[in-house]
């Protein structure tokens, strides 16, 4: 399997591309296999995933196993935004703040860190609504970590279409791509991102 291949080659960091890890019970089995590989060989040392927001019990069990074996930094509880207008414009929905608060309390009780992520620059978001959303997360109990990411326009995405850009008055900045979890070596090919500057 790919995971055994990673372990055999002593690859320390495994970033899972599944955007809804924990949705299926097989994901618990995959986690057990990963934990077994780490206990056997020491690798992978870290496993990161984006978790399904509608599978509370599976995700909690997975996060507990990874946390108990020091393989993860915590459970993702992402929001993108707490602005109803911004969420509507990007066709997203969130957990209720009450449900979020109860999940944070459950993870805190089990000593599993949680972190939340917001996206800065979504169409329909204002400075005030962004700050209000951040305050709401803190008031709901998120005291461990909140990461804020730029809103990036991706090629061939709905948000990247000319019609969408015109509808929301999106202006972008063309900036050098920020590679996380990569070597410091200079790349021969420069990559760029289109970051939302205003809407």
Language-model features and meaning:
Residues 32-33, 133-134, 163-167:
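Short, hinge-like loop/turn segments at secondary-structure boundaries
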Residues 24-25, 80, 84-91, 120-128, ...:
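Flexible glycine/acidic-rich beta-alpha junction loops that bind and position SAM and/or redox cofactors
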Residues 2-115, 120-122:
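Conserved SAM/AdoMet-binding glycine-rich loop
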Residues 68-69, 139-143:
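Intrinsically disordered, low-complexity coil segments
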Residues 49, 134-137, 148:
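Phosphate/diphosphate-binding loops
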Residues 59-63, 123-139:
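Catalytic cores of alpha/beta
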């Amino acid at each position: 399997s790919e995971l055994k291949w990673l372990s055999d080659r002593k690859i320390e960091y495994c970033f899972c591309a599944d955007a809804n890890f924990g949705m299926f019970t097989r994901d618990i089995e995959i986690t057990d296999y990963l934990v077994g590989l780490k206990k056997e060989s020491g690798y992978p040392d870290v496993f990161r995933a984006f978790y399904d927001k509608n599978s509370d019990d599976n995700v909690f069990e997975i996060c507990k196993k990874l946390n108990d074996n020091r393989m993860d930094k915590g459970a993702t509880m992402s929001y993108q935004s707490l602005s109803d207008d911004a969420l509507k414009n990007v066709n997203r929905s969130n957990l209720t703040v009450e449900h979020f608060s109860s999940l944070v309390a459950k993870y805190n009780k089990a000593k599993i860190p949680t972190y939340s992520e917001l996206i800065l620059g979504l169409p329909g978001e204002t400075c005030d609504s962004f700050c209000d959303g951040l305050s709401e997360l803190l008031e709901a109990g998120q005291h461990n970590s909140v990461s804020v990411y730029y809103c990036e326009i991706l090629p061939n995405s709905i948000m990247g279409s000319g019609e969408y850009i015109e509808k929301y008055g999106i202006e972008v900045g063309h900036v050098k791509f920020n590679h996380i979890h990569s070597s410091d070596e200079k790349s021969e090919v420069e990559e760029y991102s289109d970051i939302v500057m205003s809407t």
